[in-house]
């Protein structure tokens, strides 16, 4: 059996995953990256995206919100705002959030004081799209 790395994903609610895995692929703010056992120490910010990990032939995916990642001593720890496993994603809710965000973005001529709302709508759309992608196993 190949050497593994310990993966831990922590949200404000607590640790949701703590297991040994073969490989982790993460949505880093500077680009996606992969981590295997014995990886060099690393700190990275994490963007909204799909976090995947493999154990043997089994591949698992989580939707994660922004946060941080540390790789050290054969352990990779994610401190993220939220994390949802494929089976926990409510696709109806995600689709409604997608439609709502698209409607907000489609509004033209927003006053400058509403620019922040537009940015929030874009972030909401991105989260909804990632949730749908993870739920569909893409």
UniProtKB/Swiss-Prot annotation:
- This protein's source sits in the domain of life called Bacteria
Entry-linked CDD domains? F1-ATPase_delta (cd12152)
Annotated membrane topology: Peripheral membrane protein
> Keyword annotations for this protein?
ATP synthesis, Cell inner membrane, Cell membrane, CF(1), Hydrogen ion transport, Ion transport, Membrane, Transport
Keyword Transport in the entry? The reply is yes
InterPro entries reported for this sequence: ATP_F1_dsu/esu_C_sf, ATP_synth_F1_dsu/esu, ATP_synth_F1_dsu/esu_N, ATP_synth_F1_esu_C, ATPsynth_dsu/esu_N
Q: Does the keyword Cell membrane apply?
A: yes
Q: Where in the cell is it found?
A: Cell inner membrane
Example GO CC term: the record gives:
plasma membrane
Disulphide bonds in the chain:
none
The GO terms describing molecular function are:
ATP binding; proton-transporting ATP synthase activity, rotational mechanism
Primary location recorded for the protein, binned into one broad class: membrane
Query: What PANTHER family does the database record attribute to this sequence?
Result: ATP SYNTHASE DELTA/EPSILON CHAIN (PTHR13822), ATP SYNTHASE EPSILON CHAIN, CHLOROPLASTIC (PTHR13822:SF10)
Family the UniProt entry places it in: Belongs to the ATPase epsilon chain family.
What does the record give as the function of this protein?
Answer: Produces ATP from ADP in the presence of a proton gradient across the membrane.
Query: What subunit structure does UniProt give?
Result: F-type ATPases have 2 components, CF(1) - the catalytic core - and CF(0) - the membrane proton channel. CF(1) has five subunits: alpha(3), beta(3), gamma(1), delta(1), epsilon(1). CF(0) has three main subunits: a, b and c.
Output this protein's name: ATP synthase epsilon chain
Which organism is the protein's source?
Answer: Desulfotalea psychrophila (strain LSv54 / DSM 12343)
Q: Which gene encodes it?
A: atpC
């Amino acid at each position: 059996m190949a050497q593994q790395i310990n993966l831990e994903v922590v949200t404000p609610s607590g640790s949701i995953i703590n297991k040994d895995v073969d490989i982790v692929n993460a949505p880093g703010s500077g680009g996606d990256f992969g981590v295997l056992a014995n990886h060099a120490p690393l700190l990275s910010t994490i963007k909204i995206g799909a976090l995947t990990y493999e154990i043997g032939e089994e591949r698992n995916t989580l939707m994660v919100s922004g946060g941080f990642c540390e790789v050290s001593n054969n352990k990779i720890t994610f401190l993220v705002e939220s994390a949802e496993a494929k089976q926990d994603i409510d696709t109806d809710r995600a689709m409604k959030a997608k439609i709502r965000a698209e409607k907000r973005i489609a509004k033209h001529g927003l006053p400058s004081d509403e620019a922040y709302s537009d940015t929030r709508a874009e972030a909401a759309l991105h989260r909804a799209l990632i949730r749908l992608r993870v739920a569909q196993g893409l």
